[in-house]
């Protein structure tokens, strides 16, 4: 059902599908998990901002269902794509995705993934006040990366 909704023509079906991915993911076989991730990636890259917004809204929940290797290899690029979206309503939702990714990656591995620190800094400096506000509002929830970002900004 999730895959069928994701392939539908109308954006309303795709929007509905984004919230359903985390439910069957854990119980699915490896090949089906791969398929689910590919279809979700398609929703992240959808041409409709409403679909991308809901994909950004639900990616954090989806990330929590995955193992660390999958998060690093496949979800960080999706996060980066959403973080560079032209719609600020999509970019502001990436703060929660960053938090979910940071929680899934062990703290000792986070410095080796400079992309998280770079992404946090770019969200701090975003042109939209709504995105900057969201980062400030959720700053204390960003484990490990927040400390590295603070040190990096102070050293500048």
Question: What residue ranges belong to the model's regions?
Answer:
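Short, compositionally biased segments
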Residues: 11-13, 138, 142-156
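N-terminal alpha-helical segment
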Residues: 17, 36, 55, 74-75, ...
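Short inter-helical turns and helix N-cap capping residues of alpha-solenoid HEAT/ARM repeat scaffolds
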Residues: 9-10, 47-48, 86-87, 127-128
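Hydrophobic residues within the alpha-helices of tandem HEAT/HEAT-like
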Residues: 5-6, 20-27, 43-44, 58-66, ...
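HEAT/HEAT-like alpha-solenoid repeats
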Residues: 1-6, 30-44, 69-83, 108-124, ...
